[in-house]
Each structure stands twice: as C-alpha cells, then as structure tokens.
C-alpha cells in the first residue's frame, strides 16, 4: 500500500518525483525507471576489496536525472531493497503531493510521478527518513533541470562529492542510529569520492566552457571546496542563479545537500578539486582538459536566466513565526512532545529523539504555522544549540534578511541556510505553493532524531 504525503505528515509522522533518466530503463508507457537496488562497488584504492552499497540504478557510477524546465516529466520508482523509502526531491518547487513519495519494497509497489518542474537548476533526490543509513549507503542522485532556452555554449559536468564511513574490512560501517552521532556533529566519513570514484580524472573539453554542477552528498560534513589551477565563476546556489562571482582563494563552504553551479571558461588548463578538512587540504578529483582549442567562450557579463520564483516579500506586512531549535549535546533540551506525548529527555533518547523544533521532536506534531497562499512569511530562527544548523525548506526558497540582529540586504534566494550555533536568523519567503511542507535539518542524523517540523499553505 502506498501512503500519501499528507498521511505521512499527519499519521506516520510527516509528509516527488520527476525527470528523465540520463542513462537507464524506459518503460513502454514512457516512464523513466528509477530503481533502488544493492550493488557492489570498488570504492577503495589499489585493492580487491568490494563494498556493498545502495543506489538508484543507472549504468554509470552515479545517478543523474535530466529534465527540462516547463516540460512534463514521468518517472517510475521501483524499490528493490528490503525497506521502505520516503523519497524526496530536495529543492524542487513542485506539487506538494508529489515532492515526497512512499515507495514500499517490490515491483508491484512502484510509485509513478508526473509533473512539470518550474525551475531550471541543479537539485537532488534522496531519502527523507532513515536518512542516516540510506544516504550513507549511497541512495541519492542529482537532478538537472535544463533551462527552457538552452545554453548551448556550456558542457555539463556533474561532481557529486561524498564521504563514506568505511570499516577496516572495506564495508560500510554499520553504526547507524548511533546516539553519539545523533547528539553531536553527525556521521562523518573517512573516505572521499567524486561521482562514486576515488580521485577520478574527469575529462573536460578544452574548446568549450564547462558548467560544473556540484552536490555535497555527505550525511553531515561541510565541504570546504577549493580549486587549484582554476578560479571558476559561481553562477548558481541551490539551483537558483546569482550574480556571477569568482570562487576566490577562500573557496566555498557547501553544507550537506547544498549544490553549487560553477563555470570554467574555455582554454584553461587542468585543475584540481580539493576539500579543506580540519585545516588540511585533501585532493578529491582532477579536471583534465582534452582536445584542441576552439572559438566557444563565455559572453561578456554572462549570467544564468533567473527562475520564476516569488521575490516580492512584503516585510512590513509579513507574519513572523518563531522557530526555536533545541537539543543535541549540551543543548538544554529537558523535554519535548513526541507522537503527541510529552516526554523527558531520557525517554526521548530511548526513542531515538535528540532534537526538537518549537518543543516538538520528529514529524507528526502540530504545524509551526498555517499560511494563506501568497502570504509573506518571516521565520525567526533561534538556534539554541551548540551546533551550527543547516536548515532546508521544502517547496520554496527563502532569503536571509537578518543575521545575529544585523539586517542583511540583497542575499541570494536558496532552499538551504546555515544558522550558526547559539545565534538567531530571520528568513523571508512567499508562501506561494499550497500543501503541507517541511522545515528540516540536512544533517541526516539530526533529521532522523527529531529536527524536522511541518507547515501548511492553504
């Protein structure tokens, strides 16, 4: 039986699908087939040790779906694993009843989805619940929605960066649900890959500008992205175009689940992609130019076309909703409501809950707000914890308008923000997409242990 999104939000605890497979199966009725399955990979270097992983099947190392802005997409998800998947499209502003789908095991329980993506950009998909296990086993992929008017000068290159927690025997460490990880920084891996490979050499045409679509697929690690031998243009964050700027010497910080679009102009040399990890620089892949020079080049003042997002937030008339995040190690959480029962901290931890939003741990509680369609909303976030919190909104994009009491102007529109530990942040958005939606942590272990809440738009 398939459960509805509303059933998940209300009953189970909370509540998309889309596009075209880059490489994979196609059904007779035109659906692209996305199949969750086990597979054996060679993650480690210079060894015959194999690692059992999970994936959404295609013929390459990673799953990349392609769609076109404004065109209908049809996908059928089949779950060949032995557990249910609450499948979610992160960053996609689609219909609320399709953005999260419950997919039970077995071909007979396949979930179909048809909708038209409104935004072009770089998005991703993966599990909403049981996220620590399913994400760290590799059950995620990249969604590329191409612009309605194609940008022919650019060659697309996908870079999905992950850290895997590998045990001494080469298997994925099975310490899922570890309480220490839940109350702390989350599950940190010890082996880095790009597109499922260790230190891959990725070929780029020398004759054309290249668009690098980068996803941080890690459970909890912030990726400090660095480039050697190149200084790409940043052209989009979280799928939304920005005024282009250089990456620069300081690099970029990508929170879990965040995406960034970068452009390397034609004619450049080879480059190295590296990560800043606790003060060390770790190389993760090599970008190698091949072929002769050409005449394709970026136009002067190049920028991506903006998406049709609602940017007319009426701050003066906006409704402000307080959102208090509590929990984690030394987080001061004494009690919270879980499944309509008020529990003390010990009882919460016994049930795997370590975090709360507005006094509610996990999905299924009272919504943090009910909004009218088109209403301007300000979320007044109070991060009353000892940890930075990467927060993600479903079905919308928001803009930081105040940080730590200081007004912010002209900030980019994103679906994910970082609220520093023990600080406050105000986020503004237009509630223009009806349905039941979610505000959640993008640290997998935190969302599994309670850092998630819902809101409704009527």
Where are these regions (language model features)?
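N-terminal export signals
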Residues: 1-3, 7-25
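C-terminal segment of N-terminal export signals and the immediately downstream linker at the start
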Residues: 19-46, 50
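Short tyrosine-centred short linear motifs in exposed loops/low-complexity segments
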Residues: 70-71, 109, 115-123, 207-208, ...
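Histidine- and aromatic-rich segments of cupredoxin/plastocyanin-like copper-binding domains
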Residues: 96-106, 116, 174-317, 403-415
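N-terminal edge beta-strand
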Residues: 48-66, 190-201, 352-373
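Extended terminal and domain-junction accessory segments
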Residues: 25-37, 135-167, 242-388, 430-436, ...
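Aromatic/His-enriched, Gly/Pro-containing loop or helix-boundary segments
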Residues: 57-65, 94-123, 128-132, 248-253, ...
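Asparagine-centered strand-capping/turn motif at beta-strand->loop junctions
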Residues: 77-81, 215-217, 381-385
């Amino acid at each position: 039986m398939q459960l509805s999104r509303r059933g998940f939000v209300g009953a189970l605890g909370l509540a998309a699908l889309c596009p075209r497979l880059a490489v994979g199966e196609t059904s007779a009725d035109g659906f692209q087939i996305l199949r969750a399955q086990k597979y054996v990979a060679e993650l480690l270097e210079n060894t015959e040790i194999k690692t059992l992983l999970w994936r959404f099947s295609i013929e390459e190392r990673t799953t990349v779906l392609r769609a076109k802005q404004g065109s209908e997409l049809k996908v059928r998800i089949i779950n060949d694993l032995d557990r249910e998947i609450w499948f979610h499209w992160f960053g996609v502003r689609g219909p609320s009843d399709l953005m999260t789908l419950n997919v039970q095991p077995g071909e007979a329980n396949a979930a179909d989805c048809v909708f038209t993506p409104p935004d072009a950009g770089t998005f991703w998909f993966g599990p909403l619940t049981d996220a620590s296990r399913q994400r760290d086993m590799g059950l995620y992929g990249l969604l590329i929605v191409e612009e309605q008017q194609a940008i022919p000068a650019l060659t697309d290159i996908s870079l999905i960066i992950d850290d895997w927690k590998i045990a001494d025997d080469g298997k994925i460490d099975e310490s899922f649900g570890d309480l220490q990880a839940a109350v702390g920084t989350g599950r940190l891996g010890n082996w880095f890959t790009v597109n499922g490979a260790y230190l891959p050499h990725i070929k780029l045409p020398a004759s054309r500008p290249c668009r690098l679509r980068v996803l941080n697929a890690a459970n909890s690690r912030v990726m400090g992205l660095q480039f050697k031998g190149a200084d790409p243009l940043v052209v989009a964050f979280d799928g939304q175009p920005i005024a282009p700027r250089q990456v620069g010497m300081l690099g970029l910080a990508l929170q879990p689940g965040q995406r960034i679009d970068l452009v390397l102009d034609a004619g450049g040399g080879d480059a190295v992609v590296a990560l800043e990890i606790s003060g060390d620089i770790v190389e993760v892949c090599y970008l190698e130019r091949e072929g002769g020079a050409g005449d394709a080049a970026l136009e002067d003042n190049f920028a991506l076309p903006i998406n049709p997002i609602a940017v007319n937030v009426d701050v003066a008339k906006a409704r402000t909703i307080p959102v208090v995040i509590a929990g984690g190690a030394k987080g001061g959480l004494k009690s919270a409501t879980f499944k309509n029962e008020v529990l003390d901290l010990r009882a919460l931890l016994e049930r795997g809950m370590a975090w709360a939003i507005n006094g509610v741990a996990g999905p299924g509680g009272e919504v943090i707000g009910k909004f009218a369609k088109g209403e301007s909303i300000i979320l007044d976030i109070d991060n009353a914890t000892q940890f930075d919190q990467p927060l993600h909104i479903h079905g919308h994009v928001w803009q930081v308008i105040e940080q730590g009491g200081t007004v912010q102007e002209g900030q980019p529109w994103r679906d994910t923000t970082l609220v520093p530990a023990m600080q406050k942040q105000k986020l503004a958005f237009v509630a223009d997409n009806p349905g039941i939606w979610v505000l959640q942590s993008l640290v997998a272990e935190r969302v599994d242990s309670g850092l998630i809440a819902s809101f409704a738009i009527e």
